[in-house]
Amino acid sequence: MIYGIGIDIVEINRIKKIVIRSGDKLAKRILRKSELKLYYSKEYPVRFLSKRFAAKEAVLKAFGTGMSQGITFSQFEIFNDDLGRPMLRFFSQAAVLAKKLDLVRTHVSVSDTGLYACSIVIFEC
């Protein structure tokens, strides 16, 4: 059964302006250490950050709570499996909520063009 669906789209140029203005502050705020390591290794880090930002916003929307239940961007990470598919891993309060909701599967899809990054997340119980 589908519990929640979240979708988000972000202008890559908006994220680029934030990075130009404040350096890696945004990256450090929303990415976990493993994601931050990837961010620093990318040829196009702003594009990577834009996609992660859209995906993390979509996760919060799929939970249906936003940040109101104490869930923050750093309490979950998006990683790629051996086939390159984006996957989710929960920590802290996000893990507690995922367990409480009895989530059995999560689906993440991320895409980008020259102008936009978008993501959709589906939670199944």
UniProtKB/Swiss-Prot annotation:
Pfam families: ACPS. Its cofactor is Mg(2+). SUPFAM superfamilies: 4'-phosphopantetheinyl transferase. It comes from the Bacteria. Belongs to the P-Pant transferase superfamily. AcpS family. Its EC number is 2.7.8.7. One of its GO terms (cellular component) is cytoplasm. One of its GO terms (biological process) is fatty acid biosynthetic process. Keywords: Cytoplasm, Fatty acid biosynthesis, Fatty acid metabolism, Lipid biosynthesis, Lipid metabolism, Magnesium, Metal-binding, Transferase. This is Holo-[acyl-carrier-protein] synthase. InterPro entries: 4-PPantetheinyl_Trfase_dom, 4-PPantetheinyl_Trfase_dom_sf, ACPS, Ppantetheine-prot_Trfase_dom. It comes from Blochmanniella floridana. It is found in: Cytoplasm. GO terms for molecular function: holo-[acyl-carrier-protein] synthase activity; magnesium ion binding. Mg(2+) binds at D8, E57. Transfers the 4'-phosphopantetheine moiety from coenzyme A to a Ser of acyl-carrier-protein. It catalyses: apo-[ACP] + CoA = holo-[ACP] + adenosine 3',5'-bisphosphate + H(+).
